[in-house]
C-alpha cells in the first residue's frame, strides 16, 4: 500500500499551483502510443522533433485528416504534450535549436496501460512470483538472523518495500486489466449474439473457453506460490515480535499479507463470476435454439401459404374412420356403487386402516415387555413379526415396530457408545442394528 507523506489538502493545493491537467483526445492518445512504439525500437530512448512529426503524419493519415497542415498540428500536439508533462524536451546550444524528446514516467505509464500491460502472460506472472519468492526467502533468512537497525533496513525493509511491494502492485494491475478484458469479452459476445447467434455460437464458445482458461491458469499460478509467500511473510513477522523498533517492518509485512490475500481471493472470485456468466450465455443459447425451432416452422408455413400459387404444395393427412362413442348414456347417470367379486390378491385395502390396525396390535403385544420388565430384543421380535406378513409389508411393519419400541424405554447399552450388532430380520437381506431395551 502506498504511503502519502502529504495530506489531501496539501495535494490539492500542489496540483492547483502547478496547473496539472491531462487532456488526451483519441488523436492525441494515438500519437502518444505511436511515440511509445517507435521509442521502444531505439536503444537511447530519445527522439528528435522530425521523428515526432513523422509519427504524427502516420496518425493524421490514419484519421484521414488533411496533409497540408500536418507540421503545424504536429508542433501544437508536441507542445501540448510537453505542457502536460507527457514528454520531456531537451535543448542544447550546440544542436542549433534542434530538441531531443523523451517520454516522461507519466507518458510511459499511460502507454504501458494501453499497449504492454494489456498483453497478459502467464510466463511473466510466473517469473514475477519467482522473483518475489526469492526476495521473501532472503528477507526471511535475514530477519531470523537479526542485527542492528542498518541490517533490518537494508536486508529486510528495502527488499520488501522496493521489490516485493512493487511486484505485488504489478500483479494487482494485471488483475485489474483482466477485469477490463472480461468486460470487453462480454461486449463482444453480446454483439455477436445480437447479429447472428447461429454463426456466433462457435465464436462465443472460443471467447468463453479462452477467458476461462486464462483465469484458471492465473489462479493456479497464484495458489501454487501463495502458501510459500505467506509462510515467508509469517517468518518475518515472527522475527519482529518483541522488538519495538521494528514497527515499520511489521506494518509493511501486514500490508503485504493483506495485498497477497486480496490478490489470491480476487482470482477465485473472478472464476466464480465468470462461471456464472458462462452458464448464463449457454442458457440463453439453449433458449434461443428452442424458440428458433418454432419460429422457423411458423415462418416456413407462412411463406408456403403466401407463395402457394407460385409453388403449389399438397397437404397429406391420415384419413381414419371415426371413433363412435358406444357408451351407454344411462350408465353415466347411475350413482349406485358397482359391486362385484375380485380375487383376494386384487382386493384393495386402504393403507391408513391397515397401519392403524397393525399399530394397535403391536402396541398391545409389546406392552407385555414393559409390564413384566422383560428385556426387549428388537431384532428377534421383528423377525417373528415379519414372518407373519408378506414381503411387500415388511418395511411398514418394521417401521411401526421401531416406533412403538422406542416409546416403551431405552437400552442402557446406548450410553456406552459401542455400536450394536447387525441382526437379520427376514430372509431377503434386511438387517437391523439395535441394543436390547432393558430400561422402561
Curated annotation (Swiss-Prot):
Where in the cell is the protein located? Cytoplasm, Nucleoid
MF terms (GO), sorted A to Z: calcium ion binding
Q: Name one GO cellular component term.
A: cytoplasm
Please give the coiled-coil regions recorded for this protein: none
For the biological process aspect of GO, one term held by this record is:
chromosome condensation
| Entry keywords, A to Z | Calcium, Cell cycle, Cell division, Chromosome partition, Cytoplasm, DNA condensation
List every stretch annotated Leucine-zipper.
Answer: 208-236
Q: Family membership, please give it.
A: Belongs to the MukF family.
HAMAP family linked to this entry: MukF
What is this protein's function per UniProt? Involved in chromosome condensation, segregation and cell cycle progression. May participate in facilitating chromosome segregation by condensation DNA from both sides of a centrally located replisome during cell division. Not required for mini-F plasmid partitioning. Probably acts via its interaction with MukB and MukE. Overexpression results in anucleate cells. It has a calcium binding activity.
Q: How does it assemble?
A: Interacts, and probably forms a ternary complex, with MukE and MukB via its C-terminal region. The complex formation is stimulated by calcium or magnesium. It is required for an interaction between MukE and MukB.
Please report the name of this protein according to its UniProt entry.
Answer: Chromosome partition protein MukF
- State the organism named in the record: Yersinia pestis
Name the gene behind this protein.
mukF
